[in-house]
Amino acid sequence: MAYVLTETAAGYALLKASDKKIHKSSSLIEDLNTADKVAEQFKIHRFEKFQSAANALEEANAVIEGRVSDSLKKMLEDAKSDKKATLIVSEAKLGNAINKLGLNFSVVSDAASLDLHRAIREFLPELLPGLDDSMLKQMSLGLAHSIGRHKLKFSADKVDTMIVQAIALLDDLDKELNTYAMRCKEWYGWHFPELAKMIVDSVAYARIILTMGVRSNASETDLSEILPEELEEQVKSAAEVSMGTEITAIDLENIRALAEQIVDFAAYREQLSNYLSSRMKAIAPNLTALVGELVGARLIAHAGSLTSLAKAPASTIQILGAEKALFRALKTKHDTPKYGLLYHASLVGQASGKNKGKIARVLAAKAAVALRYDSLAEERDDSGDFGLEVRAKVESRLSALEGRDLRTTSKVVREQPKVDITEARAYNADADAPTAEVDSDDESDTEEIDTKKEKKEKKEKKEKKDKKRKREDDDEEEEDKKSKKEKKEKKEKKEKKEKKEKKDKKDKKSKKEKK
C-alpha cells in the first residue's frame, strides 16, 4: 500500500495509489500526463482542511522548516494501518521528521517522488472535490503573499535595513568628499595658493571658487554670505598680491565643475545625516540616546540587523568592530581589546586612558539592555526616556571613576555648533619670552615628582620586558619539547625497523638451514 502526502494552500491531502510500487517505476510516472490517468492512479484517502489563512501560514512554515504540526500528526495517526505502508513526501526534512514519530510508514523522498508530486499538482483540482482551479490559485496566491511577508518581517516604521545602507553610504560620501576637496585645493592652488592656508573648510573653499572664479575678480566679488567680514578682506588683499600662475577659461570651467560636485555632495551628506538621525530615533531611540546616532547605526550595520544586535551579549557588543585585533590577540596570547566601535561613543571619549576600558564595559552592558528594550519590548516607547536614564547612570559612574564632576547632557543628540571660518593660526615668534626664575623649593618639588614618574615608567617598562622574556622562554621550551618528542619517535621507529630486519634475516637463515 502506498500513500502520497501533498501540501496544498487549502490543506493536507493524503492520496492512495493503486500501484504500491509507483515511486519505483519511472515509466508509470511518465505516463501521468493527463487528468484521467492521474485520477485513475490516485484516489483521495484523507483531506485535512486548514481552518484559516493564519493557520495555513503556520502549517506552510512548519513544512518549510521540516516540522510535523499537530494537525498533520493527527491525520497520519488516523490513516496508519496494521500493515506497513509507503508514504511518499516531497520535502526530505519533513520525511525525516515523520520517520522520528515512529508511525507504521516507510517514508520515501527522492528525485522520482518529486516528479510524482509535480504530476499530481498539475491536475490537483480533479483529485480534490469541491475545489476548482480558480479557487485553488487564489488560495495559493494569498498564502504566497503571507509567506513572503512573514519571511521579510516588513514594517514601514521599523526597517533597520535602511540604517545599514544609510551609514554605509555616509561613510562612502565622507571618503569621496575628502578626495574631491584635496584634488580641488591642489588644482586651484596653482592659481591662488594663499587661499588654502586661509580657508580650512572644504565646502567654503568650493563655494568661493564658484562665486569668485579667477582671483582677479576678488575685489569685485561679494563673499559676505560665505566668509566673515575680516576674513573676506584678507582673502581679497591676498588675491591682489598672489604668487599663483594664470589659468585658462577651460581650466577654470573644469575646476568649477569639481567645486559644484563638492557643494552638492556636502548638501546631500547633510540631508542623509538628518535622515539617518530620524531613522535611528524611530527604530532604536534608547540606543541613540545612549551612544548617539552614528555609533548606534554602525553597531546595527556591523551586526546585520537590530534583532541580531539585541540578541548579542554585552561582551560581544563591547568588542564589536575589533574582531581582527581580538583574534590576533588570542593567536599571540596577548591581552584582548577592550573596545571596538564603542570607542567612538562620547562617554568613552570623556574618560581618561586608564578608565576607558571600564566605561566601555559599563556602556556595553547598558547598551545591551537598551537594545533589547528597543527590539523586543511589547510596548513601543519612542521617547528614549529609558536610554537617557541609563546614560545618566553611566555618567555618574564615569564621574565617580574620574573623581570630577562631568557636564550632564539633557539632550544626547547635540546640535553641531556653527563653525566660524577663521584664518589658520601661524606661530608668533614675538610672543616668546625667557622662562622666569623658579624658587629652589618649587624646583625641588618638581624634581621629586619627575623622579617618581621616571621610576614608575622604568618599573612598568621592566615588567613589560620581563613578561615578554617569559613568553619567549615558554615558547622556546615548548619548541624544545616538541623537537625532543619528534627525535624520540624517530629513534623508536628506527629501532623497530632494525629489529624487524634482524628478525627477517634470522627467519630466512633458518629456512635455508632447514632446506
Swiss-Prot record:
Spell out the Basic residues composition-biased ranges. Answer: 455-470, 484-515
Organism field? Scheffersomyces stipitis (strain ATCC 58785 / CBS 6054 / NBRC 10063 / NRRL Y-11545)
Recorded hits in InterPro entries, A to Z, give: Nop56/Nop58, NOP58/56_N, Nop_C, Nop_dom, Nop_dom_sf, NOSIC
Q: Which family does it belong to?
A: Belongs to the NOP5/NOP56 family.
Q: Which GO terms describe its molecular function?
A: snoRNA binding; snRNA binding
Output this protein's name: Nucleolar protein 58
Any one cellular-component term (Gene Ontology): small-subunit processome
UniProt keywords, alphabetically = Nucleus, Ribonucleoprotein, Ribosome biogenesis, rRNA processing
Q: Its function?
A: Required for pre-18S rRNA processing. May bind microtubules.
